[in-house]
Amino acid sequence: MTKLSRRVFLGSAPAAAAAAGIFGTFFSTAAEAAIKWDETYNVIVIGAGGAGLSAAVSAKEAGAKKVVVLEKMMFAGGNTIRAGGGFNAAIKADYEKAGITDSPKLHAEQTLAAGDGRGDPVLVHQLTEKAPESVQWLKDHGVKFQDHIYQIYGGLYKRARNPIGPRGGAYIKALLEVCKKEDIPILYNTRVVEIIREHQLSGRVLGVKVEQKGGKTLYLRATNAVVAAAGGFAANDRLTAISDPRMGQLGTTNHPAPPATS
């Protein structure tokens, strides 16, 4: 078994962002000996968007020898490929060059204030303190950024920068190239229908059950981790209504096949 530190893997900003919630998939109970596994990996990543691809690369760099990404669509990108691409981060060299007063601490304070103080201070500070590191991580993995910062639409402060290229697609293009270089396969048209663990809602996660195009079913075992990076639920009327019933009447800019709706 590959020795992969959970702290090292999940401690990186890109990988931590990958620990998103997954909807439309349920847990099942299965004794490991009772399942005939079709393939075994060290790390299985669900979702080939920005978070999932970052998690896969991070896992490989943290020591996982065999990593796979599962994507239910026929192409990678998720919501990231539809995003404008702007990245807010208080990077000292950038704001000093622009003559702006900024810092990760100020970024956190302004973010909390913009959310009427409802955000979790610990998580917000983690976000703003790790943002410069995440930008550097992306640069180290092939993403090139424009040489200026600006106030992104919907934002209140000047601290965003855009990648050079097709907006959010620039991130995906670079990460796909790294996955190819690192021999990280992406299984397209592969939908996760069950996360298999020792007990219904407890115990170690053993792997996943997937359905591929044409109805083929596979059981994939994970010796170290299953990372759920399958997006949110902005296109799911039932779940968004929990926060605000009016949201069910709105359209969405989310990916055409988010996890909560298919």
Where is each model-derived feature located?
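Beta1/beta-strand and adjacent pyrophosphate-binding region of the FAD-binding site
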Residues: W37-A51
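N-terminal secretory signal peptides and thylakoid transit peptides that target proteins
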Residues: M1-A17
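Aromatic pocket-lining residues of Rossmann-like dinucleotide-binding sites
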Residues: A59
